[in-house]
């Protein structure tokens, strides 16, 4: 993948008011979203550290990885997804129904957790996972700005020489 993932995994990050290695944050987040510390996709295992790098720097790639575990058939029905032998689904499959997931979760959160139906518990659980996914994915970029790839394209675009010359004149 071009990165020394193990070195990057040891970088300190601030999470929950504490400084932790990126490795701890990535493993804990993937465990919360997927209930496992790796993703099997396209014939290979993707470590939690590779996954979080994809989340931050290649979000369109991460969106295609089956990170979300969904067991409740009614929640799958809400998403318009047929239940398969696998329990794991991509963010891309969930994305079209995010507003409905949020609406259903807000309704379900009004019910005491012990009194919720399996559907209500499942939709609240999925919303919490989607919210965590969104926060992680946008930890390094502003939503709608296109991410690192778009920024690199802007820097290398046809106006790059003009911007560089203008900055040199400022200095």
Where are these regions (language model features)?
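Soluble extramembrane regions of membrane proteins in the secretory/endomembrane system
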Residues: 1-171
């Amino acid at each position: 993948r071009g990165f020394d993932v193990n070195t990057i995994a040891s970088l300190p990050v601030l999470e929950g008011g504490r400084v932790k290695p990126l490795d701890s944050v990535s493993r804990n987040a993937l465990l919360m979203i997927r209930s496992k510390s790796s993703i099997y996709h396209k014939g290979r295992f993707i470590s939690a550290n590779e996954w979080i790098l994809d989340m931050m720097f290649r979000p369109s790639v991460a969106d295609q990885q089956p990170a979300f575990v969904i067991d409740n058939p009614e929640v799958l029905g809400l998403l318009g997804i047929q239940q398969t032998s696998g329990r794991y689904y991509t963010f891309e499959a969930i994305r079209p129904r995010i507003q409905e997931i949020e609406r259903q979760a807000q309704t379900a959160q009004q019910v005491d957790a012990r009194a919720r139906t399996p559907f209500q518990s499942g939709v609240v659980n999925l919303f919490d996972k989607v919210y965590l996914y969104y926060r992680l994915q946008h930890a390094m970029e502003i939503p709608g700005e296109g991410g690192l790839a778009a920024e690199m394209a802007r820097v290398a675009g046809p106006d790059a020489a003009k911007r560089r010359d203008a900055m040199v004149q400022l200095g």
